[in-house]
Design a protein with these regions (language model features):
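Alpha-helical transmembrane segments and their membrane-interface boundaries
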Residues: 1-122, 130-157
Length: 157
């Protein structure tokens, strides 16, 4: 009969503290300097941007930032095409082929600019096409780019 190995509870290391500090500083920055803005996406950017070391942090932060930028601009363009056909917005079947086209273009652009941008770019693209309305799709996209940029910068400090 084998004896079970004792499981060691993971410790709180410097990377753990740095991640928590980055997210917390983002929230504090928004509350103090940008009180009308929601800090959630900046905090998410800070957490996603943190890696095991500086090289990994740049990679993860770049994935998140470039994905948000590519998906944001692509989503704005495709949603604008949608609004030409359906000016009132809403959910129409046209969104399905636009999503297909968008994902294909997203992957091509990610291969050109930043390979890891596909997943975060896809999230922003889907949100813009299916969850954000015609009145605020541009501001939503630009806000996500700004907030993600703030979070990624905080994770690299």
């Amino acid at each position: 009969m084998e004896t079970a190995e004792k499981r060691r509870f993971p410790g709180v290391g410097l990377r753990n503290i740095k991640t928590a500090c980055s997210a917390t500083l983002c929230a504090l920055l928004y509350f103090l300097l940008l009180p009308d803005r929601n800090p959630a996406f900046a905090c998410i950017g800070a957490i996603f941007g943190m890696g095991a070391n500086m090289e990994h942090s740049k990679l993860h932060g770049g994935n998140r930032l470039f994905g948000t930028i590519i998906g944001g601009f692509l989503g704005m363009g495709l949603y604008r095409v949608f609004l030409i056909v359906y000016p009132e917005g809403g959910h129409h079947l046209l969104l399905v082929p636009l999503l297909f086209i968008g994902v294909v273009i997203l992957i091509i652009l990610a291969q050109i600019f930043w390979v890891g941008a596909v997943q975060p770019g896809g999230v922003v693209l889907c949100l813009l096409l299916f969850s954000i309305g015609p009145d605020n799709y541009i501001s939503y996209s630009l806000n996500r780019m700004f907030d993600t940029g703030v979070g990624v910068v905080m994770s690299l400090l």
